[in-house]
């Protein structure tokens, strides 16, 4: 269970805010097939979001299902593949208890892009780029991720 807390500055009158002023509870199921000796890999992460109401605006974003996925081939020490996500809002946004807009302001998006991972000793370093192919009722853009995983 992932939990996102309302941290960061939030001001109702600002066009953009660092904080969200809501809690989000997100059950997660993640599955991966990975052979450290090399070969094909597949990872899927399923999530479902439950949002609380923003008390400053009386706005509640709808529930949403989303999946992160990656398929790749491990050549040791380099892995290359494709990564992406699909997001679909399943319930309407509501403000003052009423549906927002004719379609409930339901968001949907699909992104795809390349990934490359290099195994540096015991530390995997991954770079991935995701381009949103389409987006509805959400901002549309690109994401670039660079991550390293360390065991403690």
Spans of model-derived segments:
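Outer membrane beta-barrel transmembrane domains
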Residues: 57-152
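Outer-membrane pore/translocation modules
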Residues: 1-60, 103-107, 119
């Amino acid at each position: 269970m992932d939990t996102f807390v309302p941290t960061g500055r939030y001001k109702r009158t600002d066009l953009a805010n660092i904080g969200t002023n809501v809690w989000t509870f997100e059950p997660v199921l993640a599955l991966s097939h990975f052979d450290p000796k090399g070969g094909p890999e597949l990872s899927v992460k399923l999530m479902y979001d439950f949002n609380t109401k923003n008390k400053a605006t009386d706005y509640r974003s709808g529930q949403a299902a989303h999946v992160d996925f990656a398929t790749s081939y491990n050549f040791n020490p380099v892995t290359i593949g494709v990564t992406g996500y699909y997001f679909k809002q399943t319930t309407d946004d509501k403000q003052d208890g009423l549906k927002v807009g004719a379609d409930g302001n339901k968001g949907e998006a699909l992104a795809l892009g390349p990934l490359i991972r290099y195994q540096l000793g015991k530390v995997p370093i991954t770079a991935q780029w995701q381009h949103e192919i389409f987006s509805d009722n959400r901002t549309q853009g690109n994401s670039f991720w660079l991550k390293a995983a360390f065991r403690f």
